[in-house]
Curated annotation (Swiss-Prot):
Keywords, sorted A to Z: Phosphoprotein
Disulphide bridges, residue numbers: none
Name by which UniProt lists this protein: Protein W
Misc. comment: The P/V/C gene has two overlapping open reading frames. One encodes the P/V/W proteins and the other the C/Y proteins.
Length: 318
């Protein structure tokens, strides 16, 4: 402390001038022990006793007493300033708890007013959850007369009549989301969910979703016939005869599947038959046996010849 340092400095100067400095030093040490052993709560009390002169025996220590009295008068303004600063610090320390207590009282008053305006004097115990009713009405009356929204009225109606939802489901009516805004109906081109789903309506047409159809046997056969027309190997050429542009193939006779005109024997060369329903297959006609002649299916007169009437030219002379 500054005062202790001032006293030590004073004592050192006294020891230099007075021969009985040892006695004064012992007195100072005893004084310091008394100061250090004092309780810290006495700091804000009266400290005027610190500035009193130390009574020393008469004789050589008279100069010490005179000098201490003179210097004590000079140093009184500084000690008064220190005392005022310490008192202000102590008052500041004591004012902090008082300010905190005052703020706490204000908070308690505000809480009491807030809860007292709603539920009464016992609102704090009710809102803290004492196991009883909180005092808040589930369906408060419309005291101010403000118009309620349709969603709120609908929710209250559903709460009052819980069987209405079951009746809607039994009648097949769409059940809308209670308390939510219904999604816009996009008409024929969009998905009209009428609030049954929270997903946004798709922009594509709903008719496109019916493309997948269960295949019928006729459809499967048509697909198989179409696949048979295509060549199995990409490198192989189809076996159909090449057609020259500008020429027309002769029409097939309904009596002759080989395409040869009536009255002529069938061709012995290889021919290709490619119908619309069967794949291209090479068919090779066999030559007629020796001694027989081919007879057309239908001669010029339109009467078929019985096979038993044919005669062998090798057995009978012509």
């Amino acid at each position: 402390m500054d005062q202790d340092a001032f006293i030590l400095k004073e004592d050192s100067e006294v020891e230099r001038e007075a021969p009985g400095g040892r006695e004064s030093l012992s007195d100072v040490i005893g004084f310091l022990d008394a100061v250090l052993s004092s309780e810290p709560t006495d700091i804000g009390g009266d400290r005027s006793w610190l500035h009193n002169t130390i009574n020393t025996p008469q004789g050589p220590g008279s100069a010490h007493r005179a000098k201490s009295e003179g210097e004590g008068e000079v140093s009184t303004p500084s000690t008064q300033d220190n005392r005022s600063g310490e008192e202000s610090r102590v008052s500041g320390r004591t004012s902090k708890p008082e300010a905190e207590a005052h703020a706490g009282n204000l908070d308690k008053q505000n809480i009491h007013r807030a809860f007292g305006g709603r539920t009464g004097t016992n609102s704090v115990s009710q809102d803290l959850g004492d196991g009883g009713d909180s005092g808040i009405l589930e369906n408060p009356p419309n005291e101010r007369g403000y118009p309620r929204s349709g969603i709120e009225d609908e929710n209250r109606e559903m709460a009052a009549h819980p069987d209405k939802r079951g009746e809607d489901q039994a009648e097949g009516l769409p059940e809308e989301v209670r308390g939510g805004t219904s999604l816009p109906d996009e008409g024929e081109g969009g998905a009209s969910n009428n609030g049954r789903s929270m997903e946004p309506g798709s922009s594509h047409s709903a008719r496109v979703t019916g493309v997948l159809v269960i295949p019928s046997p006729e459809l499967e056969e048509a697909v198989l016939r179409r696949n048979k027309r295509r060549p199995t190997n990409s490198g192989s050429k189809p076996l159909t005869p090449a057609t020259v542009p500008g020429t027309r193939s002769p029409p097939l006779n309904r009596y002759n599947s080989t395409g040869s005109p009536p009255g002529k024997p069938p061709s012995t060369q290889d021919e290709h038959i490619n119908s619309g329903d069967t794949p291209a297959v090479r068919v090779k006609d066999r030559k007629p046996p020796i001694g027989t002649r081919s007879v057309s299916d239908c001669p010029a007169n339109g009467r078929p010849i019985h096979p038993g009437l044919e005669t062998d030219s090798t057995k009978k002379g012509a």
